[in-house]
A protein has these predicted regions:
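N-terminal signal-anchor transmembrane helix
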Residues: 127, 135-138
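Surface-exposed alpha-helical segments enriched in charged/polar residues
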Residues: 16-17, 48-51, 125
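Membrane-interfacial amphipathic helices and adjacent loop/beta segments
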Residues: 1-20
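Acidic metal-phosphate-binding loop of nucleotide-sugar-dependent transferases
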Residues: 31-33
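Generic beta-sheet signal
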Residues: 23-29
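A cross-family acyltransferase "interaction/gating" segment
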Residues: 4, 23, 35-119, 131-134
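C-terminal alpha-helix
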Residues: 123-131
Length: 138
């Protein structure tokens, strides 16, 4: 979705249709990927589909860690490089470990878009801090 394009309403309607058919949907609510140091501000417009269909939201966090116990800065697809450039870097990169944390699902029942976004934001921030404490070397 390009910012300012008006596509988010179209995409939200498509997501709502898929959720009504019980298809799972995966997206980055930060509207981007990050280097894994922090959770950026979430954009909640697409979460409206979960509210409209009373579908729970399943937060999942990933961080890439070097053998030295530090966050890896090559694996995350960030910045301005093309996917092909990124893939080339990843394939040439030494081994790293991807740590995945699946947080408890969040019920969308009783939430509006803003309250669901705020709750998801807080749970993801808390979860990332816990994941870092578990897998990173001080």
């Amino acid at each position: 979705i390009q910012r300012g394009s008006g596509d988010s309403d179209k995409v939200r309607q498509q997501i709502t249709g898929f959720l009504k058919q019980k298809f799972p949907i995966l997206f980055f609510p930060e509207a981007t990927t990050t280097d894994g140091q922090q959770v950026r501000r979430l954009h909640g417009r697409l979460l409206q589909s979960a509210v409209d269909t009373q579908t729970p939201v399943q937060p999942v966090l990933i961080c890439y860690v070097t053998p030295q116990g530090r966050l890896d800065m090559v694996m995350p697809f960030i910045g301005e490089m093309s996917f092909a450039e990124h893939l080339k870097q990843v394939l040439a990169h030494p081994a790293v470990t991807a740590h995945v944390m699946v947080l408890p699902a969040i019920s969308s029942v009783g939430h509006d878009m803003h309250s669901l976004t705020n709750l998801l934001q807080q749970q993801m921030r808390d979860g990332l801090a816990a994941l870092h404490a578990k897998v990173l070397v001080d």
